[in-house]
Structure formats: structure tokens, C-alpha cells
Amino acid sequence: MAADSDLRYYLGVKNAFLGHLNPQLNEASILYRNLGGAKFKDVSSEMNLVDLGWSGDATPIDGNNDGWPDLYVLSMQGHDEYYENVGGKRFEKKSRDVFPKTPWGAMGVKAFDFNNDLAVDLFLTDMHSDMSEDVGPEREKMKSRMQFGEEVLRSNGQSIFGNAFYQADGKGGFSEISDKIGAENYWPWGLSVADLNADGFQDAFLTSSMCFPYRYGVNSVLINEQGERFADAEFIVGIEPRANGQRIKPWFELDADELDVENRYCKDRTGKVVVWSALGSRSSAIFDLDDDGDLDIVTSEFNSEPMVLLSDLSDKKKINFLKIKLVGGESNRDALGARVVLKIGDRRLLQVYDGVSGYLSHSLHPLYFGLGESSQVDEIEIVWPSGKTETKIGPLDANQTLTIKENG
């Protein structure tokens, strides 16, 4: 009711879950240009970046290696979109040209170098494809046997019904290899990527599960086996099962005698009826919480308090690592967008500092490089967001935090 006592009505859409079928009703994603002084300008149309998909996330990635960040935009139902940055002047849609098939129900994304070839790969999680059927644990590592019809999917044969992993060829092309490397899991939200075992290859942590009325889904730890494939490790490293084996908790209460007597959960029951729901993680951050040299995980939870998962790796074995904190000068303060390469003998370790961590989340913390058996780094090369390249010559000792300032 408005202040003038005139009634206002809002009509909900019955098939809101199928909003992708009517993109003309959607709000467009917006690109804001930072003008400085806490002012921003909508430049979506000006930059040819008008996207009407049901998007919950996006990630920058320099897919064609021209030094300009391109943009991969997720769609929670339908086709993802990919826009190439044309010299910072505009974007060109290259979606199907570069990615012929994309996840139908994409929820999370992370760009990182999987196999240490200095090319940035792309890992996407797909949750909504898992909603089309109930499956048991035996199918959790398999693609969905999609049960929605084409009238809902609008796929035209261009969808992947599960997670996708696009391996970059370093020339602007990508190959989808999710099944080959074991990148599938069940009911994922977002993912965080970090070197959990400090061997020099980045691993992945995928938050999973859904609340009432769906069942519990385990959080996944995917250990990177030397850039060849992922190995499932959530039960080995102690992420699963949860503390005390807890997978559910009370969700809400019904009154089977009066208010909720017609509810299907109150049939043949009296008094108060407690409805239980599965626990589930939504997002995560990976960093060295207790400053002991290994990486810990903090999750955000639905209908529950956060989980703090402390690693004891450094208590069990000698590890080598290097943390790098970047401080922008000419670039943005946090140096978001910087590209860092460590040179260790014949090895090259690449990370792009984009802050992306978990579902709809960003985190600012030092870059963490696991060094394997190496106790020193020969050289660090940084390409700052400003375009400037700086090199820090070693040898640089492992097991420390370096603060590197642009033009410092």
C-alpha cells in the first residue's frame, strides 16, 4: 500500500524458473566504468556488452592472449556468452565461435592454469542440470541424463549437461575435457582454486548440496595430478564427512493440528511436525588462515554457521611455498588483473590475480604458490594491469611472504 492509500499490485510470474524463455523480460547485466571519486558509469551499450541471459556470475580471462581482458558470462539456464575485448574500445560476441557448447545451468567459474603451460584454462560448474532428475551416489561423477524437454532447454544441441573444463591451446582456442580429467561432481555451486598440497599444481574445491527438499551433496576436493587429471580427495583429506557426520538440521516447523493441517507433510500426523533440510555449502575462500604455510578453507553455509577447515599438511611434511602480496601503483590499488609467473629452473608457474573465489564471491589475499621440492625461486615476472612488466631477480627463498609494489 502506498502513502496515498491507493493499492498497488505486483503479479508474480508462475514459471519464474523458466525466465530464460522470455529474455525480453530480464534485466540486462551491466558493465560499469570506474570514473574515479567513487563514481561509476553504465557503459554496457557503448561497449557492445548487452547481455539478457539469466546470469549469476562472470569472469575476466584473456582468452586470445592480446593483453586485454575478455569476458565469459555465465547463464544459469541456457547458453553462456563470451565477449572478446577489442583494444579496450568495445566487446565483440564470440560465444559459439570459441565455445561451441557450454553448460546449460552454469553457476560458478574460475580461470587458472591447470597444467602449468602458461595458458589460462576455464573451469565451470553446472548445478541446474542436476535438477532434472534424482540420482544416487553412483552417478554423482557423471553428466546429467537431462530430463527437461527441448521446449525448456532451447539447447539446439549446444549444451553440456554438467560441469565443463576448457583447456586453452595458447592461441585463443579451447578444448572441452571435463570427463577426460574427472571434473564432474554433483549439485555444485561455485569453486575455489588453490594449491592445497603445495606441489606446484592448482587444485579445486567445489561447494555443493541443496536445501529442502533435496538430499545432501558432498563438497568436492579435486587434487590436480601433475596437470593430467583431477583425483577425488574430499574423504581422504577430511573434508567429508562433516563433523559428527551431520548432514541435516531442522528447517522449519508445521502445525499439523490447525494452521498446516492440509500440508502434505502433516498427513496422518498431529502436533508439531519438524521438517528437516540438508546442510549445504554455498561459497568458499582458501587462504592460510593460521599462517602455518599450508592452505585452509572457510565456507559459507546455507541455514548454518560457516565451516572452518584447517589443514595440517605442514605438520605432516616439509612443504615449500611463496606468498606474494601485490600493491598497485599506476594500476588499481589491489593489482587485480595482474599476471604473475614464477620461474623455478625449467618450471613456470602462472597465476592471474582476479580475486575470484567461490560462488558470487571475491577475496583479497596474497597469491600462494606451492613450490614442491624447490626451496628457492629464480625469478618473478609481473605484468601489471597497467600493462607494465616488472621482473624480480632471485634467488628468492621459499616460505616467506613477499610484498611487491608496482614501480617499487
Where are these regions (language model features)?
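Blade-edge motifs of beta-propeller repeat domains
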Residues: 2-53, 84-104, 136-186, 223-279, ...
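Structural signal for beta-propeller blades
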Residues: 29-31, 79-82, 131, 163, ...
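Hydrophobic beta-strand segments that make up the repeating blades of beta-propeller
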Residues: 1, 66, 70-75, 122-126, ...
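Gly/Ser/Thr/Pro-enriched helix-cap/hinge segments flanking short amphipathic alpha-helices
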Residues: 173, 228-229, 233-238, 250, ...
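Beta-propeller blade termini
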Residues: 33, 55-65, 69, 84, ...
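Surface-exposed loop and edge beta-strand positions of immunoglobulin-like domains
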Residues: 61, 74, 112, 125, ...
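Extended catalytic-interface subdomain
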Residues: 109-110, 114, 120-128, 134, ...
